[in-house]
């Protein structure tokens, strides 16, 4: 949160910050070791639920450069839980988190779901070379963050529909909710 306040107070974008780092330290004298990118779905009817992502993972109906997945569920209220799905190891070059941001905000700020509204978050965590490469691309194309983020997601993670007649999972069709989500980028 502090970084947003600092940038806003100076009327800087992240692209400005990256360019300033490059000018100050030289192109090869600084390195981004971690970069988190969040995509928020605040549609009343979200593109997908965390439960849908969980089921796709349980059935191994996804293709990813990141290995493994796990789930976390915590009590939200007397009737519901907040869910998180992790794909990939946290220390790997690229990992993903899908979670109920609406329930997190409700718990943190003592608000109701009606006040907050539907809010599902997709996060990509990039480390080391992947983080630095993305930051440098973003520096050169700061107005295209949505396109860059969705492109990274589309090229590295895909939820699929099983096909009994095809043993090669890479030939399976992309599931509808994922196609719709990836097509939702605001340019």
Listing of model-derived features with the role each one plays in the protein:
Residues 1-186:
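Structured, helix-rich domain cores that form ligand/interaction pockets
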